[in-house]
Amino acid sequence: MAQNFAIYPKKIEEDPQVAEAKKKVEATKPTPEEKQAAAEAEVDALVARAKKALVEFENLDQKQVDRIVAKASIAALNKHLVLAKMAVDETGRGLVEDKATKNIFACEHVTNYLAGQKTVGIIREDDVMGIDEVAEPVGVVAGVTPVTNPTSTAIFKSLIALKTRCPIVFGFHPGAQKCSVEAAKIVRDAAIEAGAPENCIQWIEHPSIQATGALMQHPGVATILATGGPGMVKAAYSSGKPALGVGAGNAPAYVDSDVDIVRAANDLVLSKHFDYGMICATEQAIIAHKDVYDQLIKELKVRKAYFVNAEEKAKLEQYMFGCTAGSGVKPVLNSAVPGKSPQFIAKAAGFEIPADATILAAECKEVSDDEPLTHEKLAPVQAVLKADNKEQAFEMCEKMLKLGAGHTAAIHTNNQELVREYGVRMHACRIIWNQPSSLGGIGDIYNAIAPSLTLGCGSYGGNSVSGNVQAVNLVNIKRIARRNNNMQWFKIPAKTYFEPNAIKYLRDMYGIEKAVIVCDKVMEQLGIVDKIIDQLRARSNRVTFRIIDYVEPEPSVETVEKGAEMMREEFEPDTIIAVGGGSPMDASKIMWLLYEHPEIAFSDVREKFFDIRKRAFKIPPLGKKAKLVCIPTSSGTGSEVTPFAVITDHKTGYKYPITDYALTPSVAIVDPVLARTQPRKLASDAGFDALTHSMEAYVSVYANDFTDGMALHAAKLIWDNLAESVNGEPGLAKTNAQEKMHNAATMAGMAFGSAFLGMCHGMAHTIGALCHIAHGRTNSILLPYVIRYNGQIPEEPTSWPKYNKYIAPERYQDIARNLGIDTGKTPAEAVENLAKAVEDYRDNKLGMNKSFQDCGVDEDYFWSVLDQIGMRAYEDQCTPANPRIPLINDMKDIAVGAYYGVSQAEGHKLRIEREGEAATEEASER
């Protein structure tokens, strides 16, 4: 049997003197621990000096800083060619001429972009908005630079650090230490001569992985400005410091069928050949539409692109990535490739190309690991692919970007819409249109992107920045915010007509051809709808009309949707006329909205807001299809002039006060003749609703000079005329009182339409919906409780800038004085006197119910919904304007007190007792 033998060479005895010398060298070689300690000691010293420079930078103003940057950039510019040659000599990569261009770019374009930028002290003042912005340096910066663009990156980072007064400590790539140090030294020396601190720019003298790691993790370093490959970026982000890191690029370039093919070919070759492809934004694959594919290849060859054959392609792949197409091996770029000439790469791969070849090009079938050349190469080697259509091309580009997420994507086309589609779809932070991607990506030469040699990849590439890194990234912006009073408003219908028989305006109103009259059955029975029809028939033009007469006392979502559907599908009116009490007017507003904007869901408009101008859902302007005319027949709601509409959702049992100025009617007609038929009970309820409107508007946190006069005068008119309008014998006195009440209700509506209301209405909406009590009557029972509640100094007042101190007690004192009620010696006395006067007016002058129990609400039912009362009242849109934040339990106490006709304090005791009993009963059941 044959045997395999291992043949070993004869052992050669080592010279004793050589062996001894080796031992001495090994003995003097530092251990890993010693290397780490030395690196940390060097970094400690550098950072300590940098922190000293940071303090010294504080003494410089903007003018001095700008002079330093200018002098430093000029000094570097003066040596741009020397530095370029040093970089090529040391690294063996790139072209001297192109590196010189990049150095000029760093000195010239970057400095020009920085000129005029404020980075010291107050950098922006906005007297209108009350914001001052103050810039301060982020602190000591750790600068990490690559071997691919060593001198230009060192210059760039030094200049933006100087501009922001940030001392920078560099950890240069060991393969480019000498040229990088020289670049930094030139900038530093010029900066110091111009007045910068001595240690404004420093670097690690003995570069190593340990030293760079120690620098990035040093507690004295504020942020890391990293440029390099994925490993360096990951290390920067893993340091525990804020990092401005970028990563790998794998830019696709799509060449569309509608393109200037000569320009595209020129740009593609120029870009790929520039500095032998070492800018990370350079195209790594050309994906051309089939209609121009052959022509593009022809134009590329005209520009001396060398297209490899199948054998050469395999050799190229093996040399560059250690595998060939279809081998199933994951490609790994040979570190000797980046920045080498096409001739060098071809020869190293095992074939020859012409001496004047500009780039190497290889036709590939797909974008994947099975086509290694579709990966990032940082060399003058280009993959070229054919796409049958736009969609296939886009898919190829997307696959390219998965190998270099977030960096850059290029497109060559004359179709702007296609560019936008491409930009939306590609996960790249720079979309370069009809430009060389390398020079387009760094900005300012071919486009208006900020000039930079550190290009962010956004979240796609695991970066904290998506733009081109600039000086703005090295400053902390502090904002000095002045207290501002929010801009307020006074909005009412464009036209408001009043006086007896004002409905005659309908005869002359412009543009009525097709009208819908929104009302309830009572309006028809009383003949009021006929009066409206008579006015329409008296017009010079013929008006067709429809009547919606099914509005309930508490209009529902279903009702308004039904009415809007009729308007949309059957009639398409140009005018909506709402006549009646608050219910028809409120219903008509939402019908108007859904008629003009059927796409809007009721669930969107009902959401609560704190500032109507900033609400999450904004109702679009109304009036394009129809005008809304509101004609009140009761003297209470004020809906004819407000942006409010109260709608009940029977599915949830909620009564929603919808509010948006788009709902403000186009025209209000306040005709007191129509209110003369109000039943006594309705007149009392409506009158107290209006009184509550005026008082809540006056104490609201949104109250202002424009609404105060309306609110106070409306309250006075109501106080003086409500009883007579309800109880008076038929005659002139009662008629005058009814007219005053009708006007007062509208004035109160104007006041609360801009000042809003408060917790009394928030609770009234809730209790009215749950307990089925008339809205005005609910307000009349709650109002004295709310006056007393708001009349105390609260635990938590409502926050509103203009409301700079709690003045509700003084405001109630104003109301009492205005109504002729004894104000006492203090606001507290005035509050109590006002509350008692309101109770007396309600009980004795109008004979209204004193409590919810008196209204016939079942006791057990009331207690069963008490929690809902508290929660829903807090959620109500009226509640946020209350001067005191109404706590849920406080509102429950008020509700209990109002149910039994006792004080809030007594209501609290009853609630606690009841809840205690319920808890005991629940425990015993368990």
In which residue ranges do the predicted regions lie?
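N-terminal Rossmann-like NAD(P)+-binding subdomain of aldehyde/semialdehyde dehydrogenases
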Residues: 3-132, 160, 302
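ALDH superfamily catalytic-core signature
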Residues: 29-30, 37, 155, 233-368, ...
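Conserved C-terminal structural/oligomerization subdomain of aldehyde/semialdehyde dehydrogenase
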Residues: 31, 58, 351-486
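Glycine/threonine-rich beta-strand-loop-alpha-helix active-site module
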Residues: 112-114, 183, 558-673
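Rossmann-like NAD(P) dinucleotide-binding subdomain of oxidoreductase/dehydrogenase enzymes
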Residues: 122-263
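ATP/NTP phosphate-donor binding region
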Residues: 487-575, 852
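Carboxylate- and glycine-rich phosphate/diphosphate-binding segment that chelates Mg2+/Mn2+
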Residues: 641-755
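Gly/Pro-rich interdomain helix-loop hinge
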Residues: 770-864, 880, 904, 910-913
